[in-house]
Amino acid sequence: HLPLSSANSINIGRLLPQSVYYFYAASRLAKPGEPIVFSIPSGNFGDMMGAVVARQMGLPVKKIIVPVNDNDAFPKFLGGGVYQKISPSRNSLSNAMNVGHPSNLARLVAVYGGQMDETGRIGRMPDLAAMRRDLFSSSISDERTRATIKEVWDKYKLLLEPHGAVAWRGFLDWEETENAERGTRSAEGSGFPAAILETANPAKFPEEIEKMMGWSPDIPPAMEITNKLPEDFDRLGADYDKFKAYLLQKHA
């Protein structure tokens, strides 16, 4: 009756537009044909899959870094080859990433030749060697997240929000691993252009920022306008027939 769609992170109609800004970032940061590194704060793995799609479309990508918070099922799987979903998910400061079993993980596993069902059971193992070649993942605790926010502010006067701090620290974890393998010092860096992604504005976390920094972040104009708008909502019970009737009436 109604042309409805869900724009959640397993909808390919969301992943395809997300893949575009990886090309845009590379066009601004890397030379033509030069590989780039992306560090993407990850929960349900939709944004990260946008980077995988971009790579599949031909974008030269050196490494896709997949930092997670305390919901560390993926880095354990990537490192040890055993997947154990986390249920219930663990609460962390980077709350948009509190996902114990990423719904896009099955899609990633399929890209590397494996098969995983919706419960997380693996029917066929992916090519883990290829995944480790292309991907890096580490788990960033709330303690490390807070320390990163302070460190980046002190060093660069750049205010990160928790998800961006997870991405920043994940990038540094990868650099340390790369330098250890090459036997070089951390100050030398990876030698590749890199884009570190954020998912929100620090103003969405005023209490946490004030605890860490002693002051509240500035609220951007667009957010100020939204905050002044009146709330408009209806309450519905968990009843499909009533929900269906509500939609039909609302959009008649």
Feature annotation, model-predicted:
Residues 1-179, 189-252:
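PLP-dependent amino-acid enzyme catalytic core
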Residues 182-185:
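Compositionally biased, intrinsically disordered low-complexity segments enriched in Pro/Arg/Gln/His
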